[in-house]
């Protein structure tokens, strides 16, 4: 008799995705981040649901309701900090997942990669509107600064900003709609993640060598499920250590001051995971130019498959490309550091150089290096 998991219409879908899925035998721990992102998403939706039960999206009570969650709700403090630090873990996994895709040429799966880029934009939007909800100083001024960037759009900019605000400044209407967006977006992310998986399972996973591995596949369960569980345990361990020992390590102290439109914080900056893009935005002394650079810094990922010039898919056997990849990682870390610094000498010039290098690496240096490596392989 055939097992029910192979015949039942619903269980068959789950079985084909998580049990009998043919998987390359040589995929490393860098392939764990996809499942970790799924875990992060589920944790964020659950903690967010419980927070939404006690939160009030109103300018007069939002800050107090967050305080109430932390002080009066049973285990409210841990739910709140799991949600805040869970976002940081989400982005750590997200950037590792993207880095893996870049290094091993996973972007050759065009549909999967493009859905991934859309997912990145959606997650960034969710994190941004979520950061506004506690209605602290950084929430308010962050929302004001970032939404104001849209006013750089010629002709319709100002109208567009006021339309998003629901008034002439960031106020009650803005907070209410941002809460609505923050509630709905994770479910859109969930739907997109399923589409991401559907496209991935059309082709099967890539592997470190970048060579097709159809002749050497193993079932996903138990070999990779046990490996994913180990990764999940490590993720939960790190998240709990962060939440219980240093819950405010990655936050901004300014956000413990209620929002005040009459007092601007000394340094307005986003959460750490947006600092690299913020540094690129600030490095161009022109509003429209900065906004375009900010948009392109993320959108450039969609063009990566077209910029692939190598005869080999993975960077595993391409030392020069490997070197440039790690230069790119170092450059992004530099931009992240610069994004958190004030706009003054020498930070400005370092930020500008790092921004130029970022685009230069992706658009010129890496494709040209790949062509040189192709030539070397023929010698």
UniProtKB/Swiss-Prot annotation:
It comes from the Eukaryota. It is found in: Mitochondrion inner membrane. Heme b b562 binds at residues 83, 182. Keywords: Electron transport, Heme, Iron, Membrane, Metal-binding, Mitochondrion, Mitochondrion inner membrane, Respiratory chain, Transmembrane, Transmembrane helix, Transport, Ubiquinone. GO terms for biological process: mitochondrial electron transport, ubiquinol to cytochrome c. Its main location: mitochondrion. InterPro entries: Cyt_b/b6_C, Cyt_b/b6_C_sf, Cyt_b/b6_N, Cytb/b6-like_sf, Cytochrome_b, Cytochrome_b_C_euk/bac, Cytochrome_b_N_euk/bac, Di-haem_cyt_TM. Its cofactor is heme b. Binds 2 heme b groups non-covalently. Heme b b566 binds at residues 97, 196. The chain crosses the membrane at residues 33-53, 77-98, 113-133, 178-198, 226-246, 288-308, 320-340, 347-367. It is a multi-pass membrane protein. A ubiquinone binds at residue 201. One of its GO terms (cellular component) is respiratory chain complex III. One of its GO terms (molecular function) is metal ion binding. Belongs to the cytochrome b family. The cytochrome bc1 complex contains 11 subunits: 3 respiratory subunits (MT-CYB, CYC1 and UQCRFS1), 2 core proteins (UQCRC1 and UQCRC2) and 6 low-molecular weight proteins (UQCRH/QCR6, UQCRB/QCR7, UQCRQ/QCR8, UQCR10/QCR9, UQCR11/QCR10 and a cleavage product of UQCRFS1). This cytochrome bc1 complex then forms a dimer. Heme 1 (or BL or b562) is low-potential and absorbs at about 562 nm, and heme 2 (or BH or b566) is high-potential and absorbs at about 566 nm. Component of the ubiquinol-cytochrome c reductase complex (complex III or cytochrome b-c1 complex) that is part of the mitochondrial respiratory chain. The b-c1 complex mediates electron transfer from ubiquinol to cytochrome c. Contributes to the generation of a proton gradient across the mitochondrial membrane that is then used for ATP synthesis. This is Cytochrome b. It comes from Balaenoptera physalus. The lineage of its organism: Eukaryota, Metazoa, Chordata, Craniata, Vertebrata.
């Amino acid at each position: 008799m055939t097992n029910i998991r192979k015949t039942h219409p619903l269980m068959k879908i789950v079985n084909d995705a998580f049990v009998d899925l043919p998987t390359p035998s040589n995929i490393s721990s860098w392939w764990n981040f996809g499942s970790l992102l799924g875990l992060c998403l589920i944790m964020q939706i659950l903690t967010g649901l419980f927070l939404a039960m006690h939160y009030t999206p109103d300018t007069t009570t939002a800050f107090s309701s967050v305080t109430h969650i932390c002080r009066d709700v049973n285990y409210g403090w841990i739910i709140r900090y799991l949600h805040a630090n869970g976002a940081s873990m989400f982005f750590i996994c997200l950037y590792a997942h993207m880095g893996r895709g870049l290094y091993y040429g996973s972007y050759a799966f065009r549909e999967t990669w493009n859905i991934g880029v859309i997912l990145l934009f959606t997650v960034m939007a969710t994190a941004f509107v979520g950061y506004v909800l506690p209605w602290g100083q950084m929430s308010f001024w962050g929302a004001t600064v970032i939404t104001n960037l849209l006013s750089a759009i010629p002709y319709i900019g100002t109208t567009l900003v006021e339309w998003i605000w629901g008034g002439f400044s960031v106020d009650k209407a803005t907070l209410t709609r941002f809460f609505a967006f923050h509630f709905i977006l994770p479910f859109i992310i969930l739907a997109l993640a399923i589409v991401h998986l559907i496209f991935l399972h059309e082709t099967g996973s890539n592997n470190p060598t970048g060579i097709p591995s159809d002749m050497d596949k193993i079932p996903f369960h138990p070999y990779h499920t046990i490996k994913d569980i180990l990764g999940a345990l490590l993720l939960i361990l790190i998240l709990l250590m962060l939440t219980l020992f240093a819950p405010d390590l990655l936050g901004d102290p300014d956000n413990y001051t209620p929002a005040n439109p009459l007092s601007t914080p000394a340094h307005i900056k986003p959460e750490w995971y947006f600092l690299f893009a913020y540094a690129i935005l600030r490095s161009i002394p022109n509003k429209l130019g900065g906004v375009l650079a900010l948009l392109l810094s993320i959108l450039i990922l969609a063009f990566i498959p077209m910029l692939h010039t190598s005869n080999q898919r993975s960077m595993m056997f391409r030392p020069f490309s490997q070197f440039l990849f790690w230069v790119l990682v170092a450059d992004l870390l530099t931009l992240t550091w610069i994004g958190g610094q004030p706009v003054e000498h020498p930070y400005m010039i370092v930020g500008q150089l790092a921004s130029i290098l970022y685009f230069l690496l992706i658009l010129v240096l890496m494709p040209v290096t790949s062509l040189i490596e192709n030539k070397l392989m023929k010698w």
